[in-house]
Swiss-Prot record:
CC cofactor: Zn(2+)
Subunit structure and binding partners: Monomer.
GO molecular function: ATP binding; cysteine-tRNA ligase activity; zinc ion binding
Lineage of the species this protein comes from: Bacteria, Bacillati, Bacillota, Bacilli, Lactobacillales
Motif 'KMSKS' region per UniProt: ranges: 268-272
UniProt-recorded name of the protein: Cysteine--tRNA ligase
Length: 447
């Protein structure tokens, strides 16, 4: 039984899908105006791991992750670069796909782009206006927050707390709003900006409405899981809930999941703070699989401090698992003991996808394998578990010359010619091949 920590209820809840053996997930993707930073990469890795574990447990997963390609940041970045907004978005969508592929993230079932859903967005906003949940003002359209029941429940706040937080903050939209808490569904076009015709004049959608429209258009009025970074709880996901449920009269998502921040020197990594490392740059000096495994060692909801030491530790641990995976088979495998490892792993991961505890079990299993319990069945299951964390090892094939040297050393040992055997061992070590003599025969690993 899989349990999920639901941000909305602040509780661990048993996962019950809307449709049997199927998971419909929507995860907020990047605003494509720059390379993603490592914090964005963690979100992609976290939800890919969750997706993979659902699949490991036998579910079919419809995994939708959008590209926000209509946004103020894109307009500004495109103008600065002397590019069209579409050309800029296309560039960074391609970069995103390349970066997350290097992190072992599977392609989404679908990556919707805002630009392809403009009429759906306009229709959605019109319904909210018709139902009295939204109003037009000077070409903008705003959502009436006070008409929404339990508006800020996801953020665990009251309207009074939001009002206090908003006091003293006056923006260019304030004079157009009925209430300072109201948020934009549609923005009137400014001169020179990309725009679409609508019943309220030329303009473009607000950020929050975009995800509501894409999620419900593709997956239906109610989805199983909606995910994203913890920074999206308010206002983005809060506003998504308000506008979606106002339109449909139904619950928008049954489970809300949020991954923790990545910190640099114990401070949240973000583009606004200027303390970020892009995945694009990180991959120039470290292996994507190492970076991914680094994040898997911490529970997805917890903040993570990005340090060089932690990366080095992840690299060492991955090397150990690789050497374990490449071991030759042994004669003895206790199926009952192996089954208990699998049960223990599942119990760890069923508890809100606790990768930290799950990986602890993986290393216990590796230790058992290295003590002489390995056959094809164990190897196949070991590989299946590792791929949940994006770890896929290619089969190492020794070239004929090295195979011949190992065989010659075995013959020398059998003839008790230990001088020759040691010389061959040293020759192999110089080529990066480490030999281990065990009761089950010789084993080798890349050093």
């Amino acid at each position: 039984m899989i349990k999920i920590y639901d941000t909305l209820t602040r509780s661990l809840r048993e996962f019950v899908p809307i449709h049997e053996n199927t998971v419909n997930m929507y995860v907020c993707g990047p605003t494509v105006y720059n390379y993603i930073h490592v914090g964005n990469g963690r979100s992609a890795i976290a939800f890919d791991t969750i997706r993979r574990y659902f699949e490991y447990r036998g579910y079919t997963v419809n995994y939708i992750s959008n590209f926000t390609d209509v946004d103020d940041k894109i307009i500004k970045a495109a103008a600065k670069a002397g590019m069209t907004t579409k050309a800029l978005s296309d560039k960074f969508i391609a970069a995103f796909k390349e970066d997350v592929a290097a992190l072992g993230v599977k392609p989404a079932t679908e990556n919707p782009r805002v630009i392809d859903y403009m009429q759906d967005i306009i229709d959605f906003v019109q319904i909210l206006v018709d139902k009295g949940f939204a109003y037009e003002s000077s070409g903008d359209v705003y959502f009436r927050v006070r008409k929404s029941d339990n508006y800020a429940a996801l953020a665990n706040k009251t309207l009074e707390e939001l009002e206090i937080g908003a006091s003293g903050r006056v923006d260019a939209e304030s004079d157009c709003k009925e209430d300072p808490l109201d948020f934009a569904l549609w923005k009137a076009a400014k001169e020179g900006e990309i725009a679409w015709d609508s019943p309220w004049g030329a303009g473009r959608p607000g950020w929050h409405i975009e995800c509501s429209v894409m999620a419900t258009t593709i997956l239906g009025d109610t989805i199983d899981i909606h995910g994203g970074g913890a920074d999206l709880e308010f206002p983005h996901h809060t506003n998504e809930i308000a506008q979606s449920e106002a339109k449909t009269g139904k619950k928008f998502a049954n489970y809300w999941m949020h991954n923790g921040f990545v910190n640099i020197d114990n401070e949240k990594m973000s583009k606004s703070l200027g303390n970020f490392i892009t995945v694009h740059d990180a991959l120039k000096t470290m292996d994507g699989q190492v970076l991914r495994f680094f994040f898997a060692t911490q529970h997805y909801r917890k903040p993570f401090n990005f340090t060089e030491k932690a990366i080095r530790d992840a690299e060492i641990n991955l090397k150990y698992l690789k050497n374990t995976y490449e071991q030759p088979f042994t004669a003895t495998v206790d199926e009952a003991v192996f089954a208990r490892f699998l049960e223990k792993f599942q119990a760890a991961m069923d508890e809100d996808f606790n990768t930290a505890n799950g990986i602890t079990v993986v290393f216990e299993l590796a230790k058992w394998i290295n003590s002489g319990h390995y056959d094809q069945t164990v190897k196949d299951k070991f590989a299946e578990i590792l791929q949940i964390f994006g770890v896929v090892f290619k089969e190492e094939v020794l070239d004929a010359e090295i195979e011949k040297l190992i065989e010659e050393r075995q013959k020398a040992r059998a003839a008790r010619d230990f001088t020759k055997a040691d010389a061959i061992r040293d020759d192999l070590a110089a080529q990066g091949i480490k030999l281990l003599d065990t009761k089950d025969g010789v084993r080798w690993m890349r050093d």
